[in-house]
Amino acid sequence: NYHVNTEKEYNEYYLNQLKEILGNPKYGNNGKFIEVWMDGARGSGAQKVTYTFDKWFEYIKKAEGDIAIFSAQPTSVRWIGNERGIAGDPVWHKVKKAKITDDVKNDYLNHGDPEGDMYSVGEADVSIRSGWFYHDNQQPKSIKDLMDIYFKFVGRGTPLLLNIPPNKEGNFA
């Protein structure tokens, strides 16, 4: 619950975290960031919150200039519509801004739109394991599977964000 009780408090808390981190020389590359990644997942059973994306994006751009923003909202970088390692064929790096809503179809995100009115790179995210977190009983994907993912993302012109979770000792295994 992030130690807040209302949407208003949550949105203020989130904005304050952005203000603390962005442009601060203690973080990033001497205070410079190239991308802010805003995951839209809330987890099962989580309360629905109406986020103040406009305020957050305004601050992010003020603090970091031409930074790329990954979000479920109409931004410069969009979710590709799945976490399985498959980008659309073809995939377009444009979308129609009005179509990027909470109800957007994953297939639309996966392919983009050749007639789109805004540039939005489809960024692919996938974990090297079957889940996002490390578990002793899970094995990493095989080289064959990773190569297949690579060709179906990067080979189709889509940046790949590969999650490699650390184990309990903090090592990447």
Segments the model singles out, each with a brief description of its role:
Residues 1-173:
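Mature catalytic domains of secreted/periplasmic carbohydrate-active enzymes
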